[in-house]
């Protein structure tokens, strides 16, 4: 048990020689607990040096060791869900010395990534995909007579998503040889592991019982009534002492729950269960943050850590991915998530019909206070984005006004529900789209790069793109009072520090504003890159418009700017393809206006992980790159170099 993060590299003699799972399998079982201890301490040290996901990895140290010890990875397929818990996996699969680069530009990904290692069988970041992917691999093995084993590791939180149960149902129907390990780390499925349940789970995982069961099955299936009676008897015995009846009903052979930190037991049960043909599920109980006292006491707060600076204390990061707030006296800028949460609470005080809905992102979306103050009007539906959106649609049918707080990347999972269940029926649902744009170290799996593009084509929906904290509050209020589907997109973290007007204002839908008059070029800005547009404009005497809405566009303002200026430059933190800039060009083309437009936004590629500033530079959206791209574009149009320079940025 550790109370502090090691600041010096720990002594890990056993781990130092285990650089691949093959070397791990050369150890005796008696050496595994020592390896797990060293692995846990090394994980504490490396995350302290770099920052990153923390609690989940500590909770699966023993499981990771056991899996790579029993399985013949990478020939056997091991599929992790979400990926927060895979740091121990990376350490044991040849990446120990690269851990200092994790979640940094050109370094290791914080999630499994197929291009990074042959041991990363499936790339993840979103939840609840592991069983489906593993089932595909297992079916492929059957079709090619490959004897490989396939194992999916999924947490109890991810198991709340419908996709996981769809995969379980298919796996059982196909009677596919695969194994699912349910990592239950917050007791949401089973409240306790009693002595009787533990005793029976040992029996059910034993070689003797498994052999007896399979032998009886071969004999009794020839006598349907006898087999059915035996199956029901076994089912009722298990149902009395374990929570596995659901999985047995689906068609899985179930063992558990067992202690997920008991290495000897894990090795024994995994090895025995892999010998059973067909679908099987091992239910283990683990503790998130295991081995580090502060994380065991506060698993949510220690979901991740910031890098530990010299002489600095540990800074936990909540599950939202943001560092915990400093003391009130040092707070200068609120996060956009705080702006949203404050607005929602203020609105709920005066509007009894407003409801808050989120798919397992209460803390990350800034809804903790709303949930505490208005519990009857708050719905955390767990990892069920599709359900969240259609739930909102049903509530809107009964004259309530739901606000769905959802990350941009996760809204992708509920697109059909947004189109079919909300927009098509013109229902009054507001979407507070968090994490729009680049998200830094979490990388492409979590980037909100596409929401303007996939929303803009939906009839009747309106899309707001606030450029600062005050615009975020006022556009949320304006969108909320629009009778129909409305979306407001805003980024992770803090804004420029605009003064927030607490009195809500109705801003006209689809109307922008001209902020700066200039010559030759005018910026048509959508969203939080506005300070960069202004800086470049001031250095070059360009004009600037803050559009506020990506849909509907301010037609009058755009036509006026196209008449006043020789060139327009659209700027957004969304994919160029189908984005707001594309909308501007479509509008001008429809009006027969030939003013050249340079659309600046995220390129047609997946940007890797790194600091937000680094990713903006890689995308050509930092101030220097914006200026350079405009210069190059103008030189092509003018036939000569346009030598304007940025000053005092």
Swiss-Prot record:
Its BP terms in the Gene Ontology are: 1-deoxy-D-xylulose 5-phosphate biosynthetic process; isopentenyl diphosphate biosynthetic process, methylerythritol 4-phosphate pathway; terpenoid biosynthetic process; thiamine biosynthetic process
Return the SMART domains for the record: Transket_pyr
- Tell me the Pfam families matching this sequence: DXP_synthase_N (PF13292), Transket_pyr (PF02779), Transketolase_C (PF02780)
Q: What Gene Ontology terms describe what this protein does at the molecular function level?
A: 1-deoxy-D-xylulose-5-phosphate synthase activity; magnesium ion binding; thiamine pyrophosphate binding
Which residues does the annotation say bind thiamine diphosphate? Answer: 84, 125-127, 157-158, 185, 292, 385
Q: Which reaction does it catalyse?
A: D-glyceraldehyde 3-phosphate + pyruvate + H(+) = 1-deoxy-D-xylulose 5-phosphate + CO2
- Give the EC number(s) listed in the UniProt record: 2.2.1.7
- Name the species this protein comes from: Saccharophagus degradans (strain 2-40 / ATCC 43961 / DSM 17024)
List the record's Gene Ontology CC terms alphabetically.
cytosol
Metabolic or biological pathway:
Metabolic intermediate biosynthesis; 1-deoxy-D-xylulose 5-phosphate biosynthesis; 1-deoxy-D-xylulose 5-phosphate from D-glyceraldehyde 3-phosphate and pyruvate: step 1/1
What does the cofactor section's free text say about binding?
A: Binds 1 Mg(2+) ion per subunit. Binds 1 thiamine pyrophosphate per subunit.
Binding residues annotated for Mg(2+), in chain numbering? 156, 185
Cofactor needs:
Mg(2+); thiamine diphosphate
Its biological purpose: Catalyzes the acyloin condensation reaction between C atoms 2 and 3 of pyruvate and glyceraldehyde 3-phosphate to yield 1-deoxy-D-xylulose-5-phosphate (DXP).
Q: Which CDD domains match?
A: TPP_DXS, TPP_PYR_DXS_TK_like
Which NCBIfam families does this one have?
dxs, PRK05444.2-2
Q: Which family does it belong to?
A: Belongs to the transketolase family. DXPS subfamily.
Q: Give the UniProt keywords, A-Z.
A: Isoprene biosynthesis, Magnesium, Metal-binding, Thiamine biosynthesis, Thiamine pyrophosphate, Transferase
The record, for PANTHER family, names: 1-D-DEOXYXYLULOSE 5-PHOSPHATE SYNTHASE-RELATED, 1-DEOXY-D-XYLULOSE-5-PHOSPHATE SYNTHASE, CHLOROPLASTIC
Its quaternary organisation is: Homodimer.
State what protein this is by name: 1-deoxy-D-xylulose-5-phosphate synthase
């Amino acid at each position: 048990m550790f109370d502090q993060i090691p600041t010096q590299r720990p002594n890990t003699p056993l781990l130092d020689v285990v650089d691949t799972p093959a070397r791990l399998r050369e150890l005796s079982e008696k050496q595994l607990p020592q390896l797990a201890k060293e692995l846990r301490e090394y994980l504490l040290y490396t995350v302290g040096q770099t920052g990153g996901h923390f609690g989940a990895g500590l909770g699966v140290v023993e499981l990771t060791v056991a899996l790579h010890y029993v399985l013949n990875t990478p020939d056997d397929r091991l599929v992790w869900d979400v990926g927060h818990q895979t740091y121990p996996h990376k350490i044991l699969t040849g990446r120990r010395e690269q851990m200092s680069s994790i979640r940094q530009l050109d370094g290791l990904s914080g999630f499994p990534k197929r291009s990074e290692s042959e041991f990363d069988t499936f790339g993840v970041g979103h939840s609840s995909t592991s069983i489906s992917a593993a089932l595909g691999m297992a079916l492929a093995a059957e079709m090619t007579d490959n004897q490989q084993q396939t194992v999916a590791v999924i947490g109890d939180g991810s198991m709340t998503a419908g996709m996981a149960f769809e995969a379980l149902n298919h796996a059982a129907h196909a009677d596919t040889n695969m194994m699912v390990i349910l990592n239950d780390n917050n007791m949401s499925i089973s409240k306790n592991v009693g002595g009787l349940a533990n005793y029976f789970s040992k029996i059910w995982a034993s070689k003797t019982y498994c052999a007896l069961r399979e032998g009886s099955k071969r004999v009794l299936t020839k006598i349907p009534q006898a087999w059915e009676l035996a199956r029901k008897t076994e089912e009722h015995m298990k149902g009395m002492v374990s929570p596995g009846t659901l999985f047995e009903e689906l068609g899985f052979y179930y063992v558990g729950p067992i202690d997920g930190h008991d290495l000897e037991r894990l090795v024994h049960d995994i090895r025995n269960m892999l010998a059973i043909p067909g679908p099987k599920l091992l239910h283990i109980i683990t503790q998130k943050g295991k081995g580090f006292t502060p994380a065991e006491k506060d698993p949510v707060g220690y979901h991740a850590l910031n890098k530990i600076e010299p002489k600095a204390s540990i800074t936990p990061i909540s599950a939202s991915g943001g560092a915990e707030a400093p003391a009130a006296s040092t707070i200068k800028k609120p996060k956009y998530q705080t702006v949203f949460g404050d607005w929602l609470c203020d609105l709920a005080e005066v509007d009894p019909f407003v409801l808050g809905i989120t798919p397992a992102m209460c803390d990350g979306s800034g809804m903790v206070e709303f949930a505490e103050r208005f519990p009857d009007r708050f719905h955390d539906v767990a990892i069920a984005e599709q359900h969240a959106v259609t739930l909102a649609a049903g509530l809107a049918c009964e004259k309530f006004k739901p606000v769905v707080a959802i990350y941009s990347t996760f809204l992708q999972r509920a697109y059909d529900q947004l189109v079919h269940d909300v927009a098509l029926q013109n229902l009054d649902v507001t979407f507070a789209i968090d994490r729009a744009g680049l998200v830094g170290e979490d990388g492409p799996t979590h980037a909100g790069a596409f929401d303007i593009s996939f929303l803009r084509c939906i009839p009747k929906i309106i899309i707001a793109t606030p450029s600062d904290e005050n615009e975020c509050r006022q556009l949320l209020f304006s969108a909320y009072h629009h009778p129909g589907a409305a979306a407001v997109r805003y980024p992770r973290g803090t804004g420029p520090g605009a003064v927030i007007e607490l009195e809500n204002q109705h801003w006209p839908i689809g109307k922008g504003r001209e902020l700066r008059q200039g010559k030759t070029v005018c910026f048509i800005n959508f969203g939080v890159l506005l300070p960069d547009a202004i800086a470049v404009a001031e250095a070059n005497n360009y004009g600037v418009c803050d559009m506020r809405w990506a849909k509907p566009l301010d037609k009058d303002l755009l036509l006026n700017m196209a008449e006043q200026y020789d060139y327009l430059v659209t700027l957004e933190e969304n994919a160029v393809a189908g984005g707001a800039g594309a909308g501007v060009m479509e509008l001008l083309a429809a009006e027969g206006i030939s003013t050249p437009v340079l659309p600046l936004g995220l390129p047609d590629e997946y940007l890797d992980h790194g600091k937000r500033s680094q990713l903006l530079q890689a995308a050509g959206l930092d101030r220097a790159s914006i200026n350079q791209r405009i210069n190059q574009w103008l030189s092509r149009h003018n036939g000569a170099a346009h030598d304007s320079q940025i000053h005092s940025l």
